């Protein structure tokens, strides 16, 4: 669980997402409240439930990006899923309880990796000893303990010399035959949608077949060390403890980001068979409110899992959701459409902005891209104009505009004489001016 303050979380999000202060503030407070709850004494702690968030805003303004960045900051079990993947129980498709099962699987994987990393030093020592045993097999006869200790001392000296060479990488390319755990039997099982848990159990049965067997492999010492280190680290990790900690982390600190919630809202003007849209909403109700989900790792309570939902709601409204589900998301945040100034910031001020990405890509072929301020401004204006004239797809429009702008440069990169390209307003107008002015062309090309 992260111990960052709301200000620090917002500051971190600012490096990647432009504007949307209200949304950033809401998720930062929600994330900090996870830590605050953990500091409260036990009787009251159980009564403090998370306040779920609904983010409303047009496409391409940063809703999903906030989720992606939040996943890295949370340091807690986190899953991002699309509401459109699920169907009502009884229909063909995935039911909503698989959200929690997937969250548990991800948490266990994350906890196991962390536990193996903590055991890395001990595992490396054990792997080193196994390699040395292969390089210098010890011959111990029946009178080993009665023999002169000089031979043992000589062996130890030789072993230390080889250990030094091994650590300095002098033996990396030498090939050795090592005994490693044989891979478990992999079986691809195709099951009807909604029966993922049964499939996992059957696959687990197949994987246990042949477990513990050894297999001889010829590898370079560098590869063998890595393989043996992973094997030794896995031996040192207590799987039961990992599963127990992961389940506890999911129940107490889990976060589910539910994207595209608007797509399962039933629009008032729609009639006919509305296949399971309302059914999915009804199935989500107990999950969001707090229920117990059966998984292969035991029963998981969802009472303290934080749900953050988002949707564009351009064809439907939040009020089109069933009232019970609306009540489960007490905090509502509206995200703003992007302005020309926002587009400029996206192109220049974020940590991995598009201009830097294209500069780095073309630099690999010796082409130096230089973006001038008026060129950036013109790019932002064109992206904004096309959004206004056609469909508003937010910051995603910049990808289309940038690709079209640098199409020829990307194609000709590597040619003799093409080593520097200046992107100013004149260059942007030459490449994109006509397309932006012609609404029919921009509708299909930009």
UniProtKB/Swiss-Prot annotation:
InterPro entries linked: AAA+_ATPase, ATP-dep_Clp_protease_ClpX, ATPase_AAA_core, Clp_ATPase_C, HslU, P-loop_NTPase
Gene Ontology biological-process entries: protein unfolding; proteolysis involved in protein catabolic process
One Pfam family it belongs to: AAA_2
Gene3D superfamilies: 1.10.8.60, DNA helicase RuvA subunit, C-terminal domain (1.10.8.10), P-loop containing nucleotide triphosphate hydrolases (3.40.50.300)
Binding of ATP, residues: 18, 60-65, 259, 324, 396
Main location: cytoplasm
Cellular localisation: Cytoplasm
Residue ranges the record marks as coiled coil: none
A single Gene Ontology CC term: HslUV protease complex
Molecular function in Gene Ontology: ATP binding; ATP hydrolysis activity; peptidase activity; proteasome-activating activity
Keyword line: ATP-binding, Chaperone, Cytoplasm, Nucleotide-binding, Stress response
Function per UniProt: ATPase subunit of a proteasome-like degradation complex; this subunit has chaperone activity. The binding of ATP and its subsequent hydrolysis by HslU are essential for unfolding of protein substrates subsequently hydrolyzed by HslV. HslU recognizes the N-terminal part of its protein substrates and unfolds these before they are guided to HslV for hydrolysis.
Subunit structure: A double ring-shaped homohexamer of HslV is capped on each side by a ring-shaped HslU homohexamer. The assembly of the HslU/HslV complex is dependent on binding of ATP.
UniProt record similarity statement: Belongs to the ClpX chaperone family. HslU subfamily.
The protein's name in its UniProt record: ATP-dependent protease ATPase subunit HslU
Organism taxonomic ancestry: Bacteria, Pseudomonadati, Pseudomonadota, Betaproteobacteria, Rhodocyclales
Originating gene: hslU
């Amino acid at each position: 669980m992260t111990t960052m303050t709301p200000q620090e979380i917002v500051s971190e999000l600012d490096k990647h997402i432009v504007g949307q202060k209200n949304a950033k503030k809401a998720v930062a407070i929600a994330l900090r409240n996870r830590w605050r709850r953990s500091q409260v004494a036990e009787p009251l702690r159980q009564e403090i439930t998370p306040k779920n968030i609904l983010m409303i805003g047009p496409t391409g303004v940063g809703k999903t990006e906030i989720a992606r960045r939040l996943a890295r900051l949370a340091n807690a079990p986190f899953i991002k899923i699309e509401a459109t993947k699920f169907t009502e129980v009884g229909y063909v498709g995935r039911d909503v309880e698989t959200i929690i099962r997937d969250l548990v699987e991800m948490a266990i994987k994350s906890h196991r990796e962390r536990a193996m990393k903590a055991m890395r030093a001990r595992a490396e020592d054990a792997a080193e000893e196994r390699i040395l045993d292969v390089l210098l097999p010890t011959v111990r006869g029946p009178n080993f303990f009665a023999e002169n200790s000089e031979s043992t001392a000589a062996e130890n000296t030789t072993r230390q010399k080889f250990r030094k060479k091994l650590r300095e990488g002098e033996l990396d390319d030498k090939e050795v035959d090592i005994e490693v755990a044989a891979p478990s039997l992999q079986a691809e099982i195709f099951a009807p949608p909604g029966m993922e848990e049964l499939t996992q159990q059957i696959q687990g049965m197949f994987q246990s077949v042949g477990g513990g067997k050894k297999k001889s492999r010829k590898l370079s010492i560098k590869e063998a060390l890595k393989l043996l280190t992973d094997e030794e680290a896995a031996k040192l990790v207590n799987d039961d403890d990992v599963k127990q900690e992961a389940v506890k982390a999911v129940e107490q600190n889990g976060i589910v980001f539910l994207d595209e919630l608007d797509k399962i809202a039933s629009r008032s003007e729609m009639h006919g068979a509305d296949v399971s849209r309302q059914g999915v909403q009804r199935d989500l109700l107990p999950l969001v409110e707090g229920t117990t989900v059966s998984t292969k790792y035991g029963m998981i309570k969802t009472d303290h899992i934080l749900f953050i939902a988002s949707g564009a709601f351009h064809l439907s409204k939040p009020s089109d959701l069933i009232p019970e589900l609306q009540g489960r998301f007490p905090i509502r945040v509206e995200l703003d459409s992007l302005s020309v100034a926002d587009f400029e910031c996206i192109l220049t001020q974020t940590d991995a902005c598009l201009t830097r990405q294209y500069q780095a890509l073309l630099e690999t072929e010796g082409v130096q891209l230089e973006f001038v301020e008026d060129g950036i401004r013109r790019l932002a204006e064109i992206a904004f104009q096309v959004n206004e004239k056609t469909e508003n797809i937010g910051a995603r429009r910049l990808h289309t505009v940038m690709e079209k702008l640098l199409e020829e440069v990307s194609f000709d990169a590597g040619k003799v004489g093409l080593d520097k390209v200046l992107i100013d307003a004149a260059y942007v107008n030459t490449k994109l001016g006509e397309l932006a002015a012609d609404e029919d062309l921009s509708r299909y090309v930009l």
